[in-house]
Amino acid sequence: MAGPLPPLNQEAAFQKLQEYYDSKGKDLNIKDLFVKDSKRFSKYSLRLHTQNDGEILLDYSKNRINDEVWDLLLTLAKVRRVNAARDAMFSGQHINITENRAVLHTALRNRGTDPVLVDDKDVMPDVRAELAHMKEFTNMVISGVWRGCTGKQITDVVNIGIGGSDLGPLMVTEALKPYGKGLHSHFVSNIDGTHLAEVLKKVNYETTLFIVASKTFTTQETITNATSAKTWLLEHSKEPESVAKHFVALSTNKEKVTEFGIDSTNMFGFWDWVGGRYSLWSAIGLSICLSIGFENFEQLLDGAHFMDNHFKTTPFEKNAPVILALLGVWYSNFFKAETHALLPYDQYLHRFAAYFQQGDMESNGKFVSKSGKPVKYSTGPIVWGEPGTNGQHAFYQLIHQGTRLIPCDFIAPAQTHNPIAGGKHHKILLSNFLAQTEALMAGKTVDEARTELSKAGLCGNELDNLLPHKVFVGNRPTNSIVVKKVSPFTLGALIALYEHKIFVQGIIWDINSFDQWGVELGKQLAKAIEPELDHCNEVSTHDSSTNGLINFIKANWK
């Protein structure tokens, strides 16, 4: 790749966008744009054709963009060298510059035969060997060959991890519940003992398998939870040998794993070129395999590989991750939008927004460029959301009539896994999905509100007083993503779509999307504070607020 990028706000293409925004862009009205162009939907939407899972539709026509804006945004992507950065990632270059690592979660789902090189070594043989190990173990557990210490078949799987070792597997197992193979999945992440205690109340030691997910096998929260789970098991089994029947490890630290009591043959590894928030495709996905079966896990990989190929080979103007990324830059850096809402209209996707809170905010929540200089423009947005229609009765009020601009992605399947009441529920759900994006775009004018109130029998002061409250400004931007059905393949494609969107935005902002130093400071300070909670003496070594909090907690400890 060429030399360092200039600061984004000094890029000529960015400055042209700023000029256009100031003169015309800020006044673009989505409703008017549809009136002026009868072909707007076909111009600003695309369909991705899968082999067996139908089409994936991305409709981005309900955005504050026109041809001029779009051409300028595409130019920005080109001058920020998104193509070169994408190729560098897929080719195994060390694009994680602060940790000197390659970024190759895409290799984990590489379904082709081409080699993938990291430091001149093809990693695919190791990837395939680990997948084969996962397949063998998964089939043993699901078939009942693997049994607990008393000879009973495994019925429950408890994944103990945190961050990327928890959020991804949890989200996917919830999303793909219709494909479950009969095992009950549980997840423990929080160091709060309540999390583990409540899970242990639900399971039987004779039929429970614990997965300890920690690359180093030293992660404080994970190892503390795993050790307490081990103590619980031994209190019931009374046999140290039972640990090897009820615990497996997702780790690369053989010494620590065997010291814990886990047979090293039941240790599943991954590599330093796999970031935590991109690790569900690796051995970290073992809990997914046990939930949905290895064949369905392969379909998840296939879907992600499909999106990888789309991202690698498709021109920017038809490239779904690039399109979503550029729209986000448009709103973050010009309209000063601070948040982005992910709104899946499918209950199985109820953890999707939480998963991409980490995926986006941990990746692009950075204030310095790759060269270490503070940036003078906005970077990663605050990402949040809930499933529809729950969100409609909670926070949509602010999206519709609040003072903040909140771009939204609406996600829905055309088909449901649960067509109860003859499909009535799903029809109501989809009617709301469709109505919300139309309402956010069109709003309700003063005249429309007045007519509506008049028809309801209001007049005079009563009508005039209520009228302002019934007006919707509209012009709220949305994307709509529709899949045929939430399947392992389409879910894999959706996850990869957002992964690559985040990557493209990081390139445009010239930040490193693959480290997370912001996680470290609080952990360092917690280690210093923890010993201060061991004694009853008042503490005075911190600021007055922290001292006061520590001393209050200690006074109320018992």
Curated annotation (Swiss-Prot):
GO molecular function: carbohydrate derivative binding; glucose-6-phosphate isomerase activity; monosaccharide binding
EC class (word): isomerase
Effect on the protein upon substituting residue 471 to A: In strain: JA-S
Disulfide bonds: none
Major place of residence: cytoplasm
Lineage: Eukaryota, Metazoa, Ecdysozoa, Arthropoda, Hexapoda
Gene Ontology annotations of biological process type: canonical glycolysis; fructose 6-phosphate metabolic process; gluconeogenesis; glucose 6-phosphate metabolic process; glucose homeostasis; glycolytic process
Reaction(s) this enzyme catalyzes, per UniProt: alpha-D-glucose 6-phosphate = beta-D-fructose 6-phosphate
Known EC number: 5.3.1.9
Annotated catalytic residues: 362 (proton donor), 393, 523
The keyword Isomerase belongs to this UniProt entry's keyword annotation: yes
Species of provenance: Drosophila melanogaster (Fruit fly)
Protein name (database record): Glucose-6-phosphate isomerase
Keywords in alphabetical order: Cytoplasm, Gluconeogenesis, Glycolysis, Isomerase
GO CC annotations, alphabetized: cytosol
Compartments, as annotated in UniProt: Cytoplasm
